[in-house]
């Protein structure tokens, strides 16, 4: 007796069962689009924690793939990874894939992979195409490319730069950096040069930087640490935050970060959301106040859902120079309590309001995270894919 795994639409199931009965095979497992995406995510990320997988897919789907011996949980890494069986299934699926790598058990490598997986699963839930194998594929959007896929022995076009991912969405081309307590220092000039060189051919109106971590609190803990360094070539992320000329967004790798990515993926999202929120009270900002998104009853209004805190600070300073003691902020509920109230409302710098669900639906259509089609998997040619008999890994 041996088992065969078949990726096929439902009409093919009975034909397979008849064949399996004649050849004394065990019953097949039908792989869905969700199943294939789980396998592909693990190929791209190398390993993913249960938390991220269960939030993105169902635990039932994950455990089914485990029972089929296509994925396995590592007690050492406390994360899921692909087995040789899972890699063989992917190899027969027709998708372009990054090279398969053996699992790593070095703690620094595990930490980097799991952080990267948080960024990737957040982007996936936001409807971003994360399954890119070449930088040139960033021309389509929304899309996310992982530079580490091109870091190989003897070939490392990204050098020692620390960019975790490149994101092309809406009008923005973003370099994403993981910023959490004790993350270390960065050579900003090298980072910006690599960012420009590797994305120069990708059309985007604005380049930006995203600082990502598990929560806003983690990012701000590092930015507020105030470390001093002796190496003048390197800078702390706080120093980068203070001197960077590009827009800089803070993003948590969770549901709020997913919604934030969807918002910035809408071209001209700042003006559109300001108009939706203020309705008939909307007044365009003065031409010399680019940090404002509108005037609300004569008061500067800033749409803060993108979490560009430096733009908020600039708006506060500009308002004070105009003789105004406060501005008005609008943001997502999960941004208001942990960050904006403490920094702006409680210090008297701003009145802070929560963006309503109806306003978000008007901008986005739906606030629900992306979910793959609840359908069996077809190849790109529209045919059934029969995977050869697979031995247990």
What are these model-derived regions, one by one?
Residues 28-51:
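Short amphipathic alpha-helical interface segments
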Residues 2-36, 106-110:
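Short alpha-helical segments that sit at the start of domains
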Residues 4-13, 117-393:
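Electrostatic, structured charged patches in enzyme active sites and in nucleic-acid/phosphate-binding
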Residues 37, 65-67, 77-79:
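Terminal low-complexity, intrinsically disordered regions
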Residues 43, 100-117:
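A short, highly charged nucleic-acid-interacting micro-segment common to nuclease
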Residues 72-98:
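Accessory beta->alpha helical hairpin/"wing" motif in late/C-terminal subdomains of nucleic-acid enzymes
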Residues 50, 54-55, 80:
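TRNA-binding/sensing appendages of the translation machinery
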Residues 54-73:
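Short amphipathic alpha-helical interaction segments
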């Amino acid at each position: 007796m041996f088992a065969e795994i078949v990726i096929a639409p439902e009409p093919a199931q009975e034909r397979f069962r008849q064949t399996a009965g004649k050849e004394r095979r065990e019953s097949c497992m039908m792989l869905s689009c969700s199943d294939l995406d789980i396998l592909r995510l693990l190929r791209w990320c190398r390993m993913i924690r249960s938390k991220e997988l269960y939030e993105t897919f169902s635990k039932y789907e994950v455990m089914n793939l485990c029972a089929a011996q296509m994925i396995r949980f590592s007690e050492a890494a406390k994360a899921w990874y692909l087995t040789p069986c899972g890699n063989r299934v992917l190899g027969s699926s027709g998708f372009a894939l990054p090279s398969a790598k053996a699992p790593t058990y070095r703690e620094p490598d595990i930490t980097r992979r799991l952080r990267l997986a948080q960024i990737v699963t957040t982007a996936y839930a936001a409807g971003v195409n994360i399954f890119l194998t070449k930088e040139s594929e960033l021309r389509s959007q929304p899309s996310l490319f992982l530079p580490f896929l091109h870091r190989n022995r003897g070939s490392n076009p990204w050098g020692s730069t620390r960019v975790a991912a490149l994101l092309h969405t809406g009008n923005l081309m973003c370099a994403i950096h993981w910023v959490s307590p004790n993350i270390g220092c960065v050579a900003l000039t090298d980072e910006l040069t690599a960012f420009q060189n590797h994305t120069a051919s990708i059309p985007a109106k604005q380049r930006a930087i995203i600082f990502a971590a598990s929560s806003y609190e983690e990012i701000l803990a590092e930015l507020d640490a105030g470390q001093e360094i002796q190496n003048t070539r390197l800078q702390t992320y706080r120093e980068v935050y203070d001197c960077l000329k590009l827009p800089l967004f803070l993003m948590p790798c969770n549901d709020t970060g997913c919604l934030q990515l969807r918002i910035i993926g809408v071209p001209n999202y700042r003006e559109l959301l300001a108009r939706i929120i203020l309705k008939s009270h909307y007044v365009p900002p003065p031409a010399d106040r680019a940090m404002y998104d509108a005037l609300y009853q004569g008061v500067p209004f800033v749409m803060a859902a993108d979490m560009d805190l430096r733009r908020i600070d600039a708006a506060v300073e500009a308002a004070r120079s105009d003789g105004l003691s406060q501005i008005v902020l609008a943001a997502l509920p999960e941004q208001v309590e942990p960050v904006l109230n403490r920094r702006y409302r409680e210090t008297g710098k701003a009145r802070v309001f929560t963006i309503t669900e109806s306003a978000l639906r008007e901008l986005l259509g739906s606030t629900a995270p992306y979910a793959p089609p609840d359908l069996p998997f077809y190849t790109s040619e529209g045919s059934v894919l029969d995977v050869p008999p697979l031995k247990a890994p």
